């Protein structure tokens, strides 16, 4: 995930935190700090806010445990784990591949909600124990709050639609029933759209009834799930469409190279005008490739600065650009490009030489070509999917 800050490793997994975690940390703190006075009165405001912050941190730790459970079970199933990231909507466990069997997929998906439900039971038992040893009521209230929120988190994630864990469970069930992981994945994604529309409707109803913050938040979550479910369906459909397709089939071969030492104004006048390319590998004076520059980056340079800014200054560093080999499956490259967003490009290399480039426009063209060649497939990308790649170019 872009803009994520690495925190280190836990249990061997790379753990990142996105800046949007600050938003949910504040929301959790505010929620608990404003709830406690109505439950246990008589404390100074600073106590409520300190306990609110402490409870929020514990809840973030619970979210991390939820994601680490996915990661641990995935590793045991032989699926590589690239990272675990906390962000606005909880967490994301980035897997380096797919489960090989429906049973393994089911276990990986269920591990997260099971952990949240177990944490709910643990915090509930802690609250009961603390009550038995005459612990201050305000501390017991925080424990009950953590038990309740973890329970809701576990149950919410079991809703039957991708990208929620419940959608992964639906996918595992359909995969086992029909023996087709693609059909199962698309079915789970479409179920996710239905779940999202229900959440949006409930959020709007709550908003109309006077629950302004809760209604907007619920509708926003529904909108996110709808968008993510559509993205999931597009990804699976594209994988099916491109089964057996190599990177060499999609790339633009022998792309023109941008000299990194010339200024942006000269580059636009001498290289870009009259060309159809949207991105260029950037080379230094000895011919080695140092990065990639796209038209969007050129546009971002103010006209007054173009004569004093070199192409190398604005190029995306090579270590941030996905790379692939010509004979590699295209689907594997698209998986690596996906986390970087719809505007991402990739360089195709043989040895130390760049032999091609893959842009969103290249992918969009290939989608159109393969749709023409397969006019009535069981599952295909929609016309909007090709437009999505094309617009990003």
UniProtKB/Swiss-Prot annotation:
Organism: Mycobacterium tuberculosis (strain ATCC 35801 / TMC 107 / Erdman)
Residue ranges of every copy of the CBS domain listed in the record: 251-308, 315-376
Example GO biological process: proteolysis
InterPro entries from the UniProt entry: CBS_dom (IPR000644), CBS_dom_sf (IPR046342), Peptidase_M50 (IPR008915), UCP006404_Pept_M50_CBS (IPR016483)
TM regions (residue ranges): 10-30, 45-65, 77-97, 108-128, 136-156, 207-227
Induction statement: A member of the dormancy regulon. Induced in response to carbon monoxide (CO). It is hoped that this regulon will give insight into the latent, or dormant phase of infection.
One Pfam family named in its UniProt record: Peptidase_M50
Location within or outside the cell: Cell membrane
Membrane topology: Multi-pass membrane protein
Main location: membrane
Knockout or disruption consequences: Not essential. No effect on processing of anti-sigma factors RsdA, RskA, RslA or RsmA.
Keyword Lipid metabolism: no
Cofactor: Zn(2+)
PANTHER family according to UniProt: MEMBRANE-ASSOCIATED ZINC METALLOPROTEASE M50B, STAGE IV SPORULATION PROTEIN FB
Gene Ontology CC terms, in alphabetical order: plasma membrane
Top-level taxon in the UniProt lineage: Bacteria
Similarity comment: Belongs to the peptidase M50B family.
Molecular function in Gene Ontology: metal ion binding; metallopeptidase activity
Cofactor note: Binds 1 zinc ion per subunit.
Record protein name field: Putative zinc metalloprotease Rip3
Keywords for this protein: CBS domain, Cell membrane, Hydrolase, Membrane, Metal-binding, Metalloprotease, Protease, Repeat, Transmembrane, Transmembrane helix, Zinc
Residues annotated to bind Zn(2+): 66, 70
Active site residues according to the UniProt entry: 67
Keyword Phosphoprotein found: no
Annotated gene: rip3
């Amino acid at each position: 995930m872009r803009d994520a800050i690495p925190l280190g490793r836990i249990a061997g997994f790379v753990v990142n935190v996105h800046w949007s975690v600050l938003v949910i940390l504040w929301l959790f703190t505010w929620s608990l700090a404003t709830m406690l006075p109505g439950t246990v009165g008589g404390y100074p405001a600073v106590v409520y806010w300190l306990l609110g912050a402490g409870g929020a941190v514990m809840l973030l730790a619970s979210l991390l445990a939820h994601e680490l459970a996915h990661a641990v079970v995935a590793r045991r199933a032989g699926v590589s784990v690239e990272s675990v990231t906390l962000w606005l909507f909880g967490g994301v466990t980035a897997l380096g591949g797919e489960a090989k069997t429906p049973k393994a997929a089911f276990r990986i998906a269920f591990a997260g909600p099971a952990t949240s439900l177990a944490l709910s039971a643990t915090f509930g038992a802690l609250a009961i124990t603390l009550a038995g040893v005459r612990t201050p009521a305000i501390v017991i209230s925080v424990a009950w709050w953590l038990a309740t929120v973890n329970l809701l988190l576990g149950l919410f994630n079991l809703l039957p639609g991708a990208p929620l864990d419940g959608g992964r469970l639906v996918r595992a069930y359909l995969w086992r029933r029909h023996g087709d992981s693609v059909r199962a994945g698309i079915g789970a994604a479409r179920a996710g759209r239905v779940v999202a529309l229900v959440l949006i409707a409930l959020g709007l109803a709550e908003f109309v009834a006077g629950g302004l913050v809760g209604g907007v938040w619920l509708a926003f979550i529904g909108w996110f799930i709808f968008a993510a479910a559509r993205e999931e369906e597009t990804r699976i459909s594209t994988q099916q469409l491109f089964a057996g397709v190599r990177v060499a089939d999609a790339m633009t071969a022998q792309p023109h190279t941008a000299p990194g030492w010339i200024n942006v104004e000269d580059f636009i006048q001498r290289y870009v005008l009259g060309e159809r390319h949207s991105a260029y590998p950037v080379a230094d004076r000895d011919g080695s490739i140092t990065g990639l520059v796209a038209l969007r980056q050129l546009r971002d340079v103010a006209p007054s600065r173009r004569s004093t800014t070199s192409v190398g200054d604005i190029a995306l560093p090579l270590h941030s650009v996905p790379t692939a080999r010509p004979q590699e499956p295209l689907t594997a490259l698209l998986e690596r490009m996906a986390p970087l967003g719809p505007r991402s490009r990739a360089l195709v290399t043989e040895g130390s030489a760049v032999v091609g480039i893959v842009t969103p426009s290249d992918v969009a063209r290939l989608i159109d070509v393969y749709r023409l060649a397969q006019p009535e497939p069981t599952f295909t990308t929609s016309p909007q999917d090709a437009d999505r790649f094309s617009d990003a170019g």
